[in-house]
Structures are given as C-alpha cells and as structure tokens.
Design a protein with these regions (language model features):
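Conserved G/P- and acidic residue-centered "switch" motifs that form tight phosphate/ATP-binding loops
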Residues: 119, 124
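Short glycine-rich phosphate-binding loop at a beta-alpha junction
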Residues: 48-57
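Active-site-facing substrate-recognition patch
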Residues: 1-49, 105
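PRPP-dependent phosphoribosyltransferase catalytic core
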Residues: 4-5, 128-170
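Short Gly/Thr/Asp-enriched flexible loops that form oxyanion-binding sites at enzyme active sites
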Residues: 62-71, 131
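Short, glycine/charge-rich flexible loops or terminal/linker lids adjacent to PRPP-binding catalytic cores
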Residues: 73-115
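Conserved acidic residues
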Residues: 51, 112, 142
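Generic enzyme active-site microenvironment
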Residues: 55, 116-117
Length: 170
C-alpha cells in the first residue's frame, strides 16, 4: 500500500542516489494516518508510550509530531548544527564525505524514555548519532523507528541498533 505512494527520484540529490520521495504518502490523509498508526504500533505493544518522540531533522519532525499527537508523549527535535537556540547538547559524527553535528535543546531534559524517529534509514550514521545525542542528554533510548528502511545500503561501522520500519527495500 505505502510503496505505491513512495516515488523514486533518480540521481537526487546527487548522481547515483535514488531518492525515496514520501511527499505523495504525506499528501494522502488516509495513507499518512495509517502509516502513523502502524509505526506507533511497532513500539506501543512493547514499551507503551515513550516520554518523548525524538524527531530527526527534518522529516523525522513530521513523524515524531504525528506520533505524539496520536499516541501521546512529547516531541524533542534533533537538529542540524546551528539551528537550535539556547542551551544545547551536541554530537558530531562522520559522513561518507565529511562530518556533521546534531544538536538538541536542553529544555525539558531530565531523563525519561525516548523513541527516535526518522523517515528513512540508509547508512545509519545519523540515527546512530541521534542515539548518542539522546543518551548524552540523559534519556534512555527505548527504540528507533523509521518509515522506510533501505536494507540494501551498507550500514556505518558498529551499527547495532534495533530499528523497526513499516516499509523495507532490499
């Protein structure tokens, strides 16, 4: 069902990358609602409602917010460097060609369980860094949740996270 609403854009954002565009799925109210219910259900039966859903910049924000509204819990944003005001905690990590930094605001930090949410899992570098960021901020990571898992993409070194997904491409 969801695969019909996920289009592939060849050579975007760079040559050799086939981008999975979720815009048609997000525009379809019934499919989007169904995806949120299915995503949340992957954890709800095991851990219940986390204290927070951590959305990864930027499309993870969409899913984390919708999950929080539907299932309960708050939303915390894991943002790209320089996008977060105030008192922050940060983690830097390596990309295939360079490095990046994620930041999280310290507002409301005091522990609790989080589920980390993103739209797509490819190499796992950003998801792994977000786990480190959440733990550095004092949260217990209950799990990782993505809409799409690109299982055919090689993972970063030492990637051993439990990730649950609604759609997988092998």
């Amino acid at each position: 069902m969801y695969e019909d609403l996920i289009t592939e854009i060849p050579d975007f954002p760079i040559k050799g990358v086939n981008f999975k565009d979720i815009s048609p799925l997000l525009a379809d109210e019934q499919a989007f609602r169904s995806a949120i219910v299915e995503m949340g259900g992957l954890y709800y039966n095991d851990v219940g409602v986390p204290d927070y859903w951590v959305g990864i910049d930027s499309r993870g924000f969409i899913f984390a917010s919708a999950l929080a509204i539907y299932f309960g819990g708050g939303v915390i944003l894991a943002r790209k460097e320089g996008k977060t005001p105030g008192d922050i905690v940060s983690v830097s990590y390596d990309l295939e060609y360079g490095s990046a930094t994620l930041e999280m605001q310290k507002v409301g930090m005091g522990g609790g369980e989080v589920v980390i949410v993103d739209d797509v899992l490819a190499t796992g570098g950003t998801l792994k860094a977000t786990n480190e960021l959440a733990e550095k901020a004092g949260y217990a990571v209950a799990g990782n949740l993505v809409l799409i898992d690109l299982k055919y993409v090689p993972r970063v070194d030492n990637f051993n996270l439990d990730v649950r997904s609604v759609v997988s491409y092998v």
